Amino acid sequence: MKKLILVASMLIAVYSCKKADAKSENNTEVTASSEAPKTSNKIVTLSGGITEIVSALGHESEIVGTDVTSTYPESLKATAKDLGHVRSMTIEPIMAVNPTLILASDKDINPELLGKIQSSGIQTEIFNQEYSVEGTKKLIEQVAKAIGNTDYQKLNNKIDEDMKQVQPIAKKPKVLFIYARGNNLMVAGKNTPMEKLIGLAGGENAINDFEDFKPLTPEAVVKANPDVLFFFTSGLQGAGGNEGVLKMPGVSQTNAGKNKNIIAMDGGLVSSFGPRLGEAVAGLNKLLIESAK
């Protein structure tokens, strides 16, 4: 009888030890899992709109390099390296910041750089950016998925809400956008972001006989005869303000010159086609309505 009791006691002890060991192992696994370090990307963004999207989604701290058009948010100036313009950028500055992910638009980027990026071995996403409300919302979704974020709908909802502020304009004003930088003056033709923005805001692009940007000439200004001259804020300042613009050859002969209808907006806001698109359209729409009074 004593032997039976002894055997039973030993079996209970062995079972208890195994149970304790199993519990200990399980606890170790849970602890290891909960303490696993979170990984984050080192992102290079080569488009102002894409930079804004990544930042608005809460990943600004992961951006290590940007292109020259990425002026917003301003806090990036202190944390991300300016890599230059995608039209003239080389691969070396990009590689120097050791990115794990490169995000770029198919607009403007030079083919040689694009080829080198795609063969660099670094994860790369090149997006087809369409300059429209729906195209921008699609871009936001695509960028969000590329960085592993699913909380993008709030950004698209904000665009829709801002677009509700846009008021119809009975007679569409002809708007000429002038890009002014130093002595370089260019005007926006068809299929440019500025043409699309002007259309969304209720205006009509004053130039429709060529695409992209071309140098400003007095003949082109007079022929276009815009009702409104539109600048980036920095460009208007560089041109000498309204008085400087009115002295430009040909301007005084246009409706815009005669009525001194000159408007300006922040360049980063109106050209990026990112999360602030609705804000940009509503702002331009308001200026166009005011200029018609």
Regions found by a protein language model. Give the residues of each.
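Sec-dependent bacterial lipoprotein signal peptides
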Residues: 1-15
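Bacterial lipoprotein signal-peptidase II cleavage site
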Residues: 17-25
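A short, structured surface patch at a secondary-structure boundary
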Residues: 42-97, 101-107
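Basic- and aromatic-lined ligand-binding clefts that recognize polyanionic substrates
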Residues: 36-57, 150-203
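Proline-aspartate-enriched helix->loop->beta-strand connector
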Residues: 90-107, 122, 217-234
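Extracytoplasmic ligand-binding site segments that recognize negatively charged/polar headgroups
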Residues: 112, 129-141, 176-193, 237-240
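His/Asp/Glu-enriched short active-site or ligand-binding loop at hydrolase and phosphoryl-transfer sites
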Residues: 67, 190-213, 233
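Structured C-terminal subdomain patch of bacterial secreted/periplasmic proteins
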Residues: 41-42, 134-147, 154, 170, ...
